[in-house]
Design a protein with these regions (language model features):
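Cationic, hydrophobic amphipathic alpha-helical membrane-interacting segments
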Residues: 1-86
Length: 86
């Protein structure tokens, strides 16, 4: 999948829920991706920041939002993998 496809998956993950934690995580991941694309953060900084989002998501995971958070974590992992290839 491309960066744009993973970003679209993030968009879908927070549009499909009213949970503010999910919405904030997805928006933050998208902002970090834009920072990487514009060269404002290094690949290593980006990967660390994205992994931090996953750690926070795992802490915040609730039964009601498990599927949404898992979908978001999959998209974030895809973005991390793409960044690692650059």
């Amino acid at each position: 999948m491309s960066v744009e496809q993973h970003q679209q998956a993030l968009l879908e993950s927070y549009q499909g829920t009213n949970d503010p934690k999910v919405q904030e995580s997805a928006r933050t991941a998208n902002e970090y991706t834009e920072l990487l694309k514009s060269g404002q953060v290094s690949k290593d900084e980006y990967i660390q920041m994205m992994q931090d989002i996953i750690r926070v998501n795992n802490i915040n995971r609730s039964v009601d939002n498990m599927q949404v958070l898992e979908h978001m974590n999959t998209a974030i992992n895809g973005l991390i993998n793409l960044a690692s290839l650059v």
